[in-house]
């Protein structure tokens, strides 16, 4: 009897959660349609790609920031035209990073179809082993197109989990210098244990500089403040003043 009650409670929780998820997505779609004002049928998203609520939160943050908003997306797909549309609305630019040549071609085809190529660049960056042996995007193709301190919004939806444990954890350490102060960051798929561990590790590493915004459920949304000058440069960033010229 106790097992049946537990099972019933679990089913009730999942049904309630699903109903709230549907309600959130409907509200997000209504906001996007009213605010983006697009007369095109952009590709449906959700499932493997980001949810509508993620794009809505990015759009809301972009409008609150004001001015041209430049965004960087790790992992391209159906969500890319949506982020490119946000960039178009604000007068900014979107850059999508993709390691798979097949998906690069598909994303480019989507952007061409929706006439968004002027507002989005797709960067092909292969996955290469780092010092710890874990694979991550080659940095050179990214940094050659994105300047330091220019990224207002970072969407982390890659590399895929199949790459290895906590595949997305290197993102902040490797890309922090590209971020503008108080940049908006999205970590997708936090329903998975590995992304939860990644977020927890970032919260510990960045402390008060990282402020989570409790708006989304399947993704984490937070702001990352730049390091204060008083915190000093990282080792090796500046020459030793005692060293002779």
Report residues per predicted region.
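Short, flexible loop segments at the rims of nucleotide/cofactor-binding pockets, characterized by
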Residues: 46-50, 73, 129-135, 160-165
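Structural motif
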Residues: 72, 153-155, 186
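SAM cofactor-binding core of SAM-dependent methyltransferases
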Residues: 47-128
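C-terminal substrate-binding/active-site "lid" region of AdoMet-derived donor-dependent transferases
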Residues: 159-245
């Amino acid at each position: 009897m106790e097992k049946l009650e537990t099972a019933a409670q679990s089913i009730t929780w999942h049904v309630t959660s699903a109903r709230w998820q549907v309600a959130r997505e409907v509200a997000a779609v209504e906001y996007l349609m009213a605010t983006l004002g697009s007369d095109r049928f952009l590709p449906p998203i959700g499932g493997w790609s980001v949810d509508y609520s993620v794009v809505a939160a990015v759009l809301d943050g972009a409008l609150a920031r004001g001015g041209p908003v430049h965004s960087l997306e790790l992992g391209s797909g159906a969500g890319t035209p949506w982020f490119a549309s946000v960039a178009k609305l604000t007068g900014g630019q979107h850059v999508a990073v993709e390691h798979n040549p097949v998906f690069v071609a598909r994303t480019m085809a989507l952007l061409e179809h929706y006439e968004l190529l002027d507002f989005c660049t797709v960067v092909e960056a292969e996955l290469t082993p780092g010092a710890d042996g874990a694979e991550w995007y080659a940095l050179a193709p990214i940094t050659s197109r994105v300047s330091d301190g220019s990224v207002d919004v970072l969407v982390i939806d890659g590399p895929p989990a199949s790459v290895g444990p906590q595949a997305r954890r290197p993102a902040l350490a490797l890309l922090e210098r590209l971020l503008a102060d108080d940049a908006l960051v999205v970590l997708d798929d936090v329903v998975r244990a590995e992304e939860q561990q990644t977020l927890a590790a970032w919260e510990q590493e960045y402390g008060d500089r990282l402020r989570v915004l409790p708006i989304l459920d399947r993704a984490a949304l937070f702001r990352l403040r730049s390091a204060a000058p008083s915190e000093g440069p990282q080792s090796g960033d500046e020459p030793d003043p005692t060293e002779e010229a």
